[in-house]
């Protein structure tokens, strides 16, 4: 995968890391998932959304965004085509006031904390929902970037963002402890592919382990950058998505999701151990 600016609609798209589908498309909306572990883990995901895309209606705000079908000129048979693409990156709550995301999300734009907010429960109730309403209590401003390290060539691409107030209505993600990451470990990805409302994608596993990251066959897309990658059995946070293969393939006048076989997985996940020591010291 390569880094790519989508300039069709917005000036900045921090998810500049396109990805793809491996085997069957396993992306699901939260309402369509029955696994209680996955539903609970989805509460830790947050969407980084530009303030200009928010319409305050009192105690809640409406996020409309651009329909996915217009953003990428999708073919009529493509999934989620009517849902809004509003997010610019994904993030995962790793402390009561700290979000972990990809460092490149904070490398592509200035004044991030001034122009963007982090939104929890950015999700739909049915597949063709064209806008999303979220309680203002679940919209958080950031105060500062407390850690940012990026060297894509060696698999380093992570940042920790401090929020202005603590998140008190949900638990943060449990980081993998002493257990060593193993090949074929089952994984689930939770975030905002193509800027969409929260999607859960499982039925993936670890293909290769590198020094600072690992390679998987997760069904991921641009703007999944920073999405939490969890162990599908224990629920532990294994890392965050950084990069992968190209996600869309042109077919004449429209585009479709690009599909690969499972063994061709090339989605890079930054290992959560790179931030564990910093977090433990910071929270003291």
Regions found by a protein language model. Give the residues of each.
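C-terminal cap/linker of serine protease catalytic domains
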Residues: 124-125, 132, 137-141, 168, ...
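RNase H-like polynucleotidyl transferase catalytic core
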Residues: 215-218, 244
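Catalytic nucleophile loop of clan PA
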Residues: 92-93, 220-242
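N-terminal signal peptide
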Residues: 14-16
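Serine endopeptidase catalytic core focused on the charge-relay Asp
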Residues: 18-33, 40-80, 84-86, 94-96, ...
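Short beta->alpha transition motifs characteristic of CBS
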Residues: 102-106, 191-194, 222, 239-247
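Sec-dependent N-terminal signal peptides
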Residues: 3-12
């Amino acid at each position: 995968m390569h880094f790519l600016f989508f300039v069709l609609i917005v000036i900045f798209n921090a998810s500049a890391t396109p990805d793809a589908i491996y085997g069957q498309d396993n992306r699901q909306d939260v309402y369509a998932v029955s696994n209680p572990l996955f539903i609970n883990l989805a509460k830790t995901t947050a969407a980084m959304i530009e303030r200009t895309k928010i319409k305050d209606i009192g105690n809640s705000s409406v996020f409309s965004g651009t329909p996915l079908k217009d953003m990428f000129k999708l073919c009529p048979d493509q999934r989620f085509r009517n849902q809004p693409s509003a997010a610019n990156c994904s993030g995962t709550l790793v402390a009561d006031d700290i979000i972990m995301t990809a460092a490149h999300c904070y490398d592509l734009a200035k004044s991030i904390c001034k122009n963007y907010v982090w939104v929890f429960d950015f999700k739909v109730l049915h597949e063709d929902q064209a806008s999303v309403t979220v309680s203002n209590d679940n919209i958080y401003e950031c105060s500062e970037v407390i850690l940012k390290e990026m060297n894509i060539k060696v698999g380093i691409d992570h940042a920790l963002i401090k929020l202005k107030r603590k998140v008190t209505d949900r638990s943060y993600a449990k980081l993998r402890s002493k257990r060593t990451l193993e090949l074929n470990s089952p994984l689930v990805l939770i975030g905002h592919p193509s800027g969409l409302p929260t999607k859960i994608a499982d039925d993936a596993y670890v293909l290769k382990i590198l020094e600072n990251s690992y390679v998987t066959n997760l069904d991921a897309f641009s703007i999944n950058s920073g999405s939490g990658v969890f162990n599908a059995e224990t629920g532990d946070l294994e890392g965050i998505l950084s990069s992968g293969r190209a996600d869309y393939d042109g077919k004449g006048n429209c585009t479709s999701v690009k599909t690969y076989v499972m063994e061709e997985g090339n989605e890079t996940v930054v290992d959560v151990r790179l931030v564990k020591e910093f977090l433990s010291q910071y929270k003291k």
